[in-house]
């Protein structure tokens, strides 16, 4: 008789290989889950790389910053791999990987743009919301500047409107360090190599 018990998801299986998958919009729910997985993997082994695969259209700035801050908080190197698209907050997370360990596949695309926000309420509420989004725009540009070597002014100018980058353009800009067609060409086999190899 076949086992009818609950089967672990493919994402649980990937986690055993220290792979975290962000394959959707960045939201509070998946940001909390990704941050928890980063902390779990760091607690299990603070020296082994953690792999974050990204195929995301972006999403919530505050949720994305929770992931970003956790990536910086753990002692592990974070290997990022962009597959499909890394747009908006997805771009920031891809770029936030450990320098030298940021990868993109040949057909992936990266989107840089300024943060979006919808405003409503009283004039005071709208002013407060506008100040918050301007602060976040400044902070996101500073992070991208530090990670790419571009000036904050250049990042702001380049992201003033939606700007899509091919894999090669993303490499040239400094969002990533390598273009790879195979996990075998990624540090640690992209998380697919047996432990200790």
Curated annotation (Swiss-Prot):
It is found in: Cytoplasm. Keywords: Cytoplasm, Hydrolase, Protease, Serine protease. The active site is at residues 88, 113. It catalyses: Hydrolysis of proteins to small peptides in the presence of ATP and magnesium. alpha-casein is the usual test substrate. In the absence of ATP, only oligopeptides shorter than five residues are hydrolyzed (such as succinyl-Leu-Tyr-|-NHMec, and Leu-Tyr-Leu-|-Tyr-Trp, in which cleavage of the -Tyr-|-Leu- and -Tyr-|-Trp bonds also occurs). GO terms for biological process: protein quality control for misfolded or incompletely synthesized proteins. One of its GO terms (molecular function) is serine-type endopeptidase activity. It holds the Pfam family CLP_protease. Its main location: cytoplasm. GO terms for cellular component: cytoplasm; endopeptidase Clp complex. It comes from the Bacteria. Its EC number is 3.4.21.92. Belongs to the peptidase S14 family. Cleaves peptides in various proteins in a process that requires ATP hydrolysis. Has a chymotrypsin-like activity. Plays a major role in the degradation of misfolded proteins. Fourteen ClpP subunits assemble into 2 heptameric rings which stack back to back to give a disk-like structure with a central cavity, resembling the structure of eukaryotic proteasomes. This is ATP-dependent Clp protease proteolytic subunit 1. It comes from Leifsonia xyli subsp. xyli (strain CTCB07).
